[in-house]
Curated annotation (Swiss-Prot):
Binding sites annotated in the UniProt record for Mn(2+) 2: K265, D270, D288, E349
Localization, UniProt: Cytoplasm
Name this polypeptide is given: Probable cytosol aminopeptidase
Domain of life where this protein originates: Bacteria
Function: Presumably involved in the processing and regular turnover of intracellular proteins. Catalyzes the removal of unsubstituted N-terminal amino acids from various peptides.
Transferase among keywords: no
């Protein structure tokens, strides 16, 4: 993990110094002084607009002409229009800076910031820049045994001086705890499925959360059978690896305060079962447990901050595999709620896992609010692509709060429709419901949401986040490499902090 240190200006000792310049290309007195120290290098660079325009996100690394100094490079970072800067933009700028200096093989970087930028204090800006750099520093190369030394290069340290280092440190420490939740989510999601079996994954959850004073219970197939979880168990019955239900209870508020329940789909690998998927890109189905990973990452972020809230996380961990013992299309399963479901397609398995998991959370903890997170449908990818996750909810206020939280951390949500017509589409001729709609290719994400909605108890606020299009990416972003994004952790942490802290 990138080492970030807030220190006094005279203690800065770095190879590269970051310089913020907006699109007006005007230097304040501090930058004029720095420019003079470097023999006009900054002013000469910005005078040539072919080299640097101050556009937001533009990064220009220029070698220092002062041979005797410790600073070997100046890193010009474009702010664009200061009036248009947001927390998201500042944080992502930190990520862009980190990525550029990494490519330039610069081991240590520094930032001196004493003045406000737009409406943000120097300590606020510094904490956001550092947070973005930290998130962008993530790597998953543990299985790359033949990497060349040059490809293993990482930025070692980021030293920052502000007009209030104590405040900057305090702000960043919170960001760092959230990043640890994001990194766990990315790590476990990126792991190959032969490494993260349900048992191993469950043990990793317990190892990290029990150190944060979170009570963790791991239910095996015998316990789930006794509870009547026929839907979840049906999905996993074709696998040699036993299914697990992991229950994480964090009590940061008083015992009488209501719980928030976070429920995650944890299909460790999804072949589609007997309704077998095409082989093309099937390897990406290791990411079909990203909803569960987001729940665990959120629990880490919340518990490590010791937030004064009561939260329970429930994740169903299964493998959807074909075998002689696998669930068949046409099978009928009885859920923990007592309702029955006809399994018309074994590749619509995530909703079956969630049906029992959300019911368990409600029965045991009586939460005021249930939010489930799942890479549930390909239909949501068709609808929203890789930009938005779908948000379905029975409560307008809850949906609005989630969408607002998502906007604030750039984990976007788009409200999707629920309607009685969609609900009718999952009626079955022989059971209480079917696990797919009866109109082929129609409203697939909405019918899936309605399946889960049938397991939400009276009076419970509920939201379903379908993250199938945003959980992993085939290209890097400003805040991380390609692969697992860690989507949902920062969104849910922000939502909880804004709405449930006592």
């Amino acid at each position: 993990m990138l080492h970030v240190n807030f220190t006094e200006e005279e203690s800065l000792n770095t190879q590269a110094l970051i310089v913020f310049i907006d699109d007006k290309l005007k230097l304040d007195s501090e930058l004029i002084n720095l420019d003079q120290q470097h023999h006009g290098l900054i002013s000469k660079t910005i005078a040539n607009k072919l080299q640097f325009t101050g556009k937001y996100g533009q990064i220009k690394i220029i070698p220092s002409v002062v041979k005797s100094g410790e600073v070997k490079y100046l890193v010009l970072a474009g702010l664009g229009s200061e009036e248009k800067l947001t927390e998201v933009k500042i944080e992502e700028l930190g990520g862009k800076i980190l990525q550029n200096v990494t490519n330039a093989k610069i081991a240590t970087i520094g930032l001196k910031i004493k003045n406000r930028i737009s409406n943000f204090t120097s300590s606020h800006v510094a904490s956001l820049i550092a947070s973005g750099a930290l998130l962008a520093s993530y790597r998953f190369d543990k299985y790359r045994t033949t990497l060349k030394e040059a490809d293993k290069f990482v930025v070692e340290s980021f030293e920052i001086s502000t007009d209030n280092n104590a405040e900057a440190t305090k702000l960043f420490e919170v960001k760092k705890l959230i990043a640890e939740g994001v990194f766990f989510t990315r790590d476990i999601s990126n792991e190959p499925s032969n490494i993260k079996t349900p048992q191993i994954y469950a043990e990793r959850i317990a190892d990290i959360l029990e150190e944060l004073n979170v009570d963790v219970s791991i239910l095996g197939e015998r316990e789930m059978k006794n509870l009547g979880m026929g839907a979840l168990l049906g999905v996993g019955q074709g696998s040699q690896n036993e299914s697990k239900l992991v229950v994480m209870e964090y009590q940061g508020a008083n015992k009488d305060a209501p719980y928030i329940a976070l429920v995650g789909k944890g299909v460790i690998f999804d072949t589609g079962g007997i309704s077998l998927k095409p082989s093309n890109n099937m390897h990406l189905m290791r990411y079909d447990m990203c909803g569960s990973a987001a729940v665990v990452g959120t629990m880490i972020a919340v518990a490590s901050q010791e937030l004064p809230v009561n939260i329970v996380g429930v994740v169903g961990l299964v493998e959807n595999m074909p075998s002689g013992n696998a669930q068949r299309p046409g099978d009928v399963v009885t859920t923990m709620s007592g309702q029955t479901a006809e399994v018309l397609n074994t590749d619509a398995e995530g909703r079956l896992v969630l049906a029992d998991a959300v019911w368990y959370a409600q029965e045991k903890f009586k939460p005021k609010c249930v939010i489930d997170v799942a890479t549930l449908t390909g239909a949501i990818v068709v609808s929203l692509g890789p930009t938005y996750a779908g948000c379905f909810s029975n409560n307008d206020e809850l949906a609005d709060k989630l969408i607002k939280a998502g906007e604030e951390v750039n984990e976007k949500l788009w409200r999707m429709p629920l309607h009685e017509d969609y609900d009718a589409m999952i009626n079955s001729d022989i059971a209480d419901m079917a696990n797919i709609g009866n109109v082929p290719g129609a409203a697939g994400s909405s019918t899936a949401a309605h399946f889960i909605k049938r397991f939400i108890q009276e009076g419970v606020e509920w939201a379903h986040l379908d993250i199938a299009g945003v959980a992993n990416s085939n290209k890097p972003s400003s805040l991380g490499p390609k692969g697992a994004v860690g989507y949902g952790v920062r969104l849910l942490e922000k939502f909880i902090k804004e709405n449930y802290e006592q």
